[in-house]
Regions:
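Scaffold/interface architecture of coatomer-like assemblies
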Residues: 1-367
């Protein structure tokens, strides 16, 4: 379950609770929950609905041709999300226009975000910054990577390391949609060294083509970095070798994932294997992939069946992040070997759904 190591042995869980209609529930207390680690009851040490811990956010945007028709809507919606999550300009102290919302909380010192786009390469467009202007500039300028080196590989269901070798000019070079590599690199290289509350927001069709990392590698990296992953699935159309794809469907909403209804030369690495990799007979089921990424990391899954509802989805993500509970506990057993520990958080209220991570990795003791 979603964790950040605040102290050597203290575990922190960001927790979202929703009712049967998918509405956020924000009036619960520690007494409403039961917590276990590896099947053993644990004592909740602290429980709060808001925190001064800084937010570290990462926007990961699929710029492959399969989702190209939604790019303009995605730029605008992601820009508004940046204003919601970083509402105070660091230079002037003035709020962004339209940045207030029912769920918004005061910004903690140190709140910052970065932007990555991925297609046949993974490219860091803007490193961690608290500047809305820098993020808006890169979002507005964001385009698919030049196709000079593109060699669209087969869809990757996460079972093996498929794709083409080498590192790209702005990141990894290879197939057509390096989703797993983007998650891995964002988690391992950017998020892992940071403290505070950490979340990735991913916009994609979920069909990986060409990544070196597997689906489990990507999720494992997010777990090790204590990162929640929120996913936005937009189907688009299958990529074609001659031109851009067509449209994707009509209005949609939320579901699955536990929710009712430049950096060239980034290194690779291995990961764990704690779950299956869903695929349909026709190939990878991108929707199931995006649902699994969200559910296994304590985030939420959303489906944008219509590009015009991206604003609504980003607003829901912002509210979920700002209104989540933060729970801490000290495990009853000490693990100095860096093992994975399964965490289960439940509430006695049967009409509510608790959303948090599957578990956490214990810190390895210094030799």
């Amino acid at each position: 379950m979603a964790t950040l190591k605040v102290q050597a042995r203290e575990v922190l869980l960001p927790v979202v609770v929703v009712d049967k209609h998918g509405a956020l529930v924000t009036n619960l207390a520690a007494k409403d929950f039961t917590l276990t680690e590896d099947g053993r009851p644990q004592t909740i040490k602290s429980f709060a609905s808001q925190s001064n811990l800084p937010f570290r956010l990462g926007l990961l945007v699929d710029t492959s041709h399969s989702v190209y028709t939604a790019m303009d809507s995605e730029r605008k919606a992601a820009g508004k999300f940046v204003d919601l999550m970083l509402p105070t300009d660091p230079a002037t102290g003035t709020p962004a226009e339209g940045s207030s919302s029912p769920g918004s909380k005061a910004v903690a010192q140190g709140d910052e975000a970065f932007l990555i786009h991925f297609d046949h390469e993974v490219e860091l467009l803007e490193d961690f910054t608290n500047s809305r202007d820098k993020l808006h500039h890169e979002l507005d300028a964001m385009t698919p990577t030049s196709q000079e080196h593109s060699n669209q590989g087969p869809e990757n269901n996460g079972d093996d390391h498929s794709g083409n070798g080498g590192y790209g000019h702005g990141g990894r070079e290879g197939g057509g949609t390096q989703l797993y590599d983007a998650i891995y690199l964002a988690s391992d290289e950017l998020m892992k060294p940071k403290s505070g509350r950490k979340a990735l927001v991913i916009f994609s069709d979920g069909a990986d083509r060409g990544s070196k990392e597997t689906l489990n590698d990507a999720i494992d990296a997010a777990d090790r970095a204590n990162v929640q992953v929120f996913t936005i699935y937009f189907k688009g159309e299958e990529e074609r070798s001659n031109g851009f794809p067509g449209n994707g469907g009509h209005h949609g909403g939320m579901g699955g994932g536990g929710y009712p209804g430049g950096g060239g030369g980034w290194p690779g690495g291995g990961g764990g294997n704690r779950g299956p990799n869903p695929r349909s007979e026709a190939g990878v089921d991108g929707k199931k992939i995006m649902q699994q990424i969200a559910s296994r990391t304590g985030g939420l899954f959303f489906e944008a069946k219509k590009k015009d509802n991206l604003d609504e989805i980003y607003n829901l993500i912002a509210n979920s992040l700002r209104q989540q509970y933060l729970l801490t506990y000290t495990p009853d057993k000490v693990d100095t070997e860096g093992g994975f520990h399964k965490v289960v958080l439940k509430t006695e209220k049967s009409d509510l759904t608790v959303i948090t991570r599957e578990g956490y990795y214990a810190p390895v003791a210094d030799k």
